[in-house]
Amino acid sequence: MKICLVSDSHDNRSLLTAAVGEAKELGAQVVWHCGDVVAPTALRPLQQFGLPVHVIHGNNMGDTYAMFMLAQEPNSVIFYHGQDAGLEQGGKRIFLVHYPHYAHALALTGDWDIVCCGHDHRPAIKTIDTVKGGNALLLNPGTVAGVGPRASYIFGDLETMEFEIRDVPGGKK
């Protein structure tokens, strides 16, 4: 299963749409959003891709009720999880949380194969040694909106566990 991981879209519909569009062309089957959507309507353009979008909120969250209602609309692709989400997809245990320090702590537990975060706008792919003797991947896609650093997202394959940080088409480099 191929994934598109984004975070910190900060209402930038055009760059969010560009990232998800490119990821779908590359074969993405699902989108994970690690928060700071701001206005829930910023996710509406993602409907066109027909991919499930799992989203949590961050510290820049607009109307959570509107987000909940958007997810309840008929044929909605939005799955709103609140402040964090534990998912099982492609045979992997995934956790989405906005803050990197929580993500690091969760990765250390060994309870998750992949822990994803955002918030600091710094893209990173790290392997974390867990307390159970294995390892977990800690993924931070940076900011898809290009607020501060370049606009970026992560494209990955859950089967091969290969992930790459990609520049968003049309975003600053």
What are these regions (language model features)?
Residues 85-87, 146, 171-173:
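A short acidic, often aromatic-flanked loop/helix-cap motif at beta-alpha or helix-coil junctions
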Residues 23-27, 89, 108-110:
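Glycine-rich phosphate-binding loop signature in dinucleotide/nucleotide-binding domains
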Residues 1-49, 64, 68-69, 75-76, ...:
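N-terminal active-site segment of His-dependent metallophosphoesterases
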Residues 33, 88-89, 156-158:
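Generic beta-strand structural signal
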Residues 41-55, 133-136:
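Short acidic, glycine/proline-enriched helix-loop-strand junctions
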Residues 54, 93-95, 99-168:
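Conserved beta-sheet core of the metallophosphoesterase superfamily
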Residues 7-10, 35-37, 58-61, 99-101, ...:
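Active-site metal-binding loops of divalent metal-dependent hydrolases
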Residues 50-99:
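Helix-adjacent hinge/juxtasegments
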